[in-house]
Amino acid sequence: MFQGAVALSLDAKGRLAIPARHRDALTPDGAPLVMTVHPHRCLLVYPLTAWEPIREKITSLPGMDQATLSFKRMLVGFAQEETLDAAGRVLVAQSLRQFAALDKQVWLVGQGTHFELWSDAGWQKQQEAMLALVDNPLPAGLENFVL
């Protein structure tokens, strides 16, 4: 279970040091992890075993409609398998860094089965958008949710 948000830094080569507490779950037995893009201009970071059923679902989507094709191209087309180096770092491909506008400071945000990787500016903007929703009714299924 991946949870929490932590500010991290990309090094000059575009590598990200994965926090030690998440390494074994993210890359069990040295398995690769998968990074791909999200339409909100962040990256998704999955253990390979969690990504594979998602990829299968996406690639089996029927359709010649533009929305389905674009969805497939985005999520599967940008997907990259990467392995951690001996220091627990993973290279974030230039194409992915460019898509998500990642600079030196980034945010790794747990989402249960995976992480989101945000630029500092993108994460700040996302937090402001979440706070703006406070005055709106909760979405279906969360009406009775109490913290």
From Swiss-Prot:
Chief subcellular location equals: cytoplasm
The alphabetical list of record keywords is: Cytoplasm, DNA-binding, Repeat, Transcription, Transcription regulation
Q: Specify the superkingdom.
A: Bacteria
Similarity field: Belongs to the MraZ family.
Q: How does it assemble?
A: Forms oligomers.
Its protein name is Transcriptional regulator MraZ
Enumerate the spans annotated as SpoVT-AbrB domain. 5-50, 79-122
Enumerate the Gene Ontology biological process terms.
negative regulation of DNA-templated transcription initiation
| GO MF annotation: an example | DNA-binding transcription factor activity
A family per Pfam? MraZ
Name a GO CC annotation attached to this entry. Answer: nucleoid
Q: Where in the cell is it found?
A: Cytoplasm, Nucleoid
